[in-house]
């Protein structure tokens, strides 16, 4: 076999810190390679043969390899192995995604779509959030320091001391290759469940991508224009639609290859079936539950709240999320190096109190910024729309920010924002850093505060689970005046202002609850059409509010002092660089 051409390289900024500052670091590749592979061969650790088999089986053409910073040393060798191992007649092209627009745990569908890739191989740690567009294979890596027999001895001691109690075993992704060994030990024990993780995402598993690939190849049997789904030319002999649906009647048009009216009429047939395959994240099977991307298959007891959790691995964001989301349950952690199974004593109460404090700040905020930190997780767009409607219904103003990877300088540019709410994957949704000038809330916290609901101790980091609560009882009709009731701890005066006692500052906070922008536009259009007189009271009220807001600002910009600055002749300034000016005393 002749050597294949070298792979195309596509990389973004290789920043090595969370704030995207580029730092030059010398890396010992051999030492890094030895530490990460930890006794496995290169092919075993990166599962090269499995990836090649999937590529050939599904006839993928453009493959994107997404690697985190700590695995970039393997990018060239990895891409060459895949490129050279697939026969030339398949005509594959391999790209390397060196860094992501957001967190490295999320699949970078944005960059991959720019490359028009049809398959992504995600290496390293993953949040396992459901995707919406492209099939993905997860390669987690491996570690050899876990001994299944030693773990079973410690677990048996715990189970013996806590009879009649149920346990669910979670594990770090690096120990996924040990999962079957653990399952074989406890498959006959109804009180112990071992979670399972699939190495492929939801798009690959439901095979929805195959319909798209089939139709791209067939191009609707070449009987339609190139823009098949938008074409008005219909062929009565074709029973195959662009959405992959089949019509039992060969004389009828099907799928998307119809006129605009026919597309609208049959949207719930072919196209809607494809849509449900892509964005449905709910599990209709009562015997299963999905937690942090891990599937739990229940045996007897089906209430997850009646289980204790066991975590195998080091401290991680996944463990933190389990502790926060299931704060009423016992969580045990197996310390691999010490061979001990101990109850995890993370100060959950303190963390929950901090999150409740941020939730109270949401009530005091007048302007709320929605920070988008993912463009690939399912229902992110619907969640943003729901947050905007909830904020507007509460008499506040929402602004949406897409700033890429989150850091302090980016958000510091928007001083008018009172508080931010972040839409991110469940592992990156809690931002507890004190470096940010304004607090960052989660969709769950914002929904809890703006609806003035009593907090029961429940906490949800996955906005996919928050979304049904977000749109619950929320009117989508902007003309509905009763869509947002005044909470019990707030009072509305004659001018429409809401008086709220802040538990954070201990003061009365006054917020103006004016009509939404959409309502004002609709009323203005109706007034212009009817020719009635226009009231300008609201306009003066808006000007008054803006003036009051500016008067409370401590910094109002540079003072021009026109006509007050004395005129002087030009003088010699400083020369050199900021590190060492020529006019410094040490250089004289």
From Swiss-Prot:
Keyword entries, A-Z: Iron, Iron-sulfur, Metal-binding
Biological processes per GO annotation: protein histidyl modification to diphthamide
Cofactor: [4Fe-4S] cluster
Pathway: Protein modification; peptidyl-diphthamide biosynthesis
Transmembrane residue ranges: none
UniProt GO MF annotations: 2-(3-amino-3-carboxypropyl)histidine synthase activity; 4 iron, 4 sulfur cluster binding; metal ion binding
InterPro entries xrefs: DHP2, DPH1/DPH2, DPH1/DPH2_1, DPH1/DPH2_3
Bias-annotated ranges (Low complexity): 11-28
Record's function text: Required for the first step of diphthamide biosynthesis, a post-translational modification of histidine which occurs in elongation factor 2. Dph1 and dph2 transfer a 3-amino-3-carboxypropyl (ACP) group from S-adenosyl-L-methionine (SAM) to a histidine residue, the reaction is assisted by a reduction system comprising dph3 and a NADH-dependent reductase. Facilitates the reduction of the catalytic iron-sulfur cluster found in the dph1 subunit.
Record-given protein name: 2-(3-amino-3-carboxypropyl)histidine synthase subunit 2
Native organism: Dictyostelium discoideum
Lineage: Eukaryota, Amoebozoa, Evosea, Eumycetozoa, Dictyostelia
Gene name of the encoded protein: dph2
């Amino acid at each position: 076999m002749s050597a294949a051409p070298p792979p195309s390289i596509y990389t973004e900024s290789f920043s090595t810190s969370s704030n995207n500052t580029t730092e030059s670091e010398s890396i010992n590749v051999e030492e890094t390679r030895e530490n990460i592979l930890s006794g496995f061969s290169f092919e075993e650790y990166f599962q090269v043969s499995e990836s090649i088999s999937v590529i050939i089986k599904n006839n993928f053409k453009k493959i994107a390899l997404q690697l985190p910073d700590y695995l970039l040393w393997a990018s060239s060798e990895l891409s060459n192995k895949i490129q050279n191992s697939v026969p030339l007649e398949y005509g594959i092209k391999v790209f390397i995604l060196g860094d992501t627009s957001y967190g490295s745990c999320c699949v970078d569908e944005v960059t991959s779509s720019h490359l028009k890739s049809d398959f992504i191989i995600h290496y390293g740690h993953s949040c396992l959030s459901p995707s919406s567009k492209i099939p993905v294979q997860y390669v987690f890596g491996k570690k050899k320091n876990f001994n299944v027999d030693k773990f079973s001895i410690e677990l048996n001691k715990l189970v013996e001391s806590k009879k009649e109690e149920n346990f669910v075993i979670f594990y770090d992704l690096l120990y996924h290759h040990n999962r079957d060994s653990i399952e074989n030990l406890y498959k006959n024990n109804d009180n112990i469940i071992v979670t399972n993780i699939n190495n492929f995402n939801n798009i690959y598993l439901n095979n929805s991508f195959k319909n798209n690939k089939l139709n791209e190849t067939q191009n609707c049997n070449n009987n339609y224009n190139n823009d098949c789904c938008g074409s008005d030319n219909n062929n009565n002999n074709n029973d195959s639609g662009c959405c992959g649906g089949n019509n039992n009647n060969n004389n009828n048009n099907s799928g998307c290859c119809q006129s605009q009216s026919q597309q609208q009429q049959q949207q719930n047939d072919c196209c809607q079936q494809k849509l449900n395959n892509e964005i449905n994240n709910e599990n209709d099977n009562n015997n299963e539950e999905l937690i942090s991307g891990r599937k739990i298959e229940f045996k007897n007891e089906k209430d997850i709240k009646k289980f204790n959790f066991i975590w195998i691995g080091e401290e991680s964001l996944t463990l933190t999320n389990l502790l926060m989301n299931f704060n009423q349950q016992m969580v045990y952690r197996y310390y691999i190096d010490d061979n001990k199974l101990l109850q995890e004593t993370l100060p959950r109460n303190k963390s929950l109190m901090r999150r409740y404090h941020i939730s109270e700040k949401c009530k005091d905020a007048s302007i709320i910024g929605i920070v988008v930190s993912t463009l690939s997780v399912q229902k992110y767009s619907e969640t943003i729309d729901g947050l905007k409607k909830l904020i507007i219904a509460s008499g506040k103003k929402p602004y949406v920010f897409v700033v890429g990877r989150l850091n302090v300088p980016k958000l510091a540019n928007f001083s008018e924002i009172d508080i931010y709410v972040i839409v991110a994957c469940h592992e990156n949704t809690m931002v507890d850093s004190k470096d940010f000038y304004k607090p960052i809330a989660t969709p769950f916290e914002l929904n809890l505060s703006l609806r003035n609901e009593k907090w029961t101790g429940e906490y949800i980091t996955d906005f996919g689970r928050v979304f049904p609560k977000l749109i619950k009882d929320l009117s989508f009709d902007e003309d509905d005046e009763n869509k947002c009731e005044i909470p019990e701890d707030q009072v509305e005066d004659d001018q429409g202002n809401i008086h709220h006692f802040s538990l954070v500052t201990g003061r009365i906070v006054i917020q103006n609850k004016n009509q939404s922008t959409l309502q004002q536009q609709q009323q203005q259009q109706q007034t212009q059409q009817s020719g009635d007189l226009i009231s300008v009271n609201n306009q003066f009220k808006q000007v008054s509010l803006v003036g009051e807001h500016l008067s409370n600002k401590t910094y109002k910009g540079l003072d021009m002092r026109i006509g007050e600055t004395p005129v002087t002749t030009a003088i010699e300034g400083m020369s050199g660089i900021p590190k060492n000016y020529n006019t410094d005393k040490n250089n004289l």
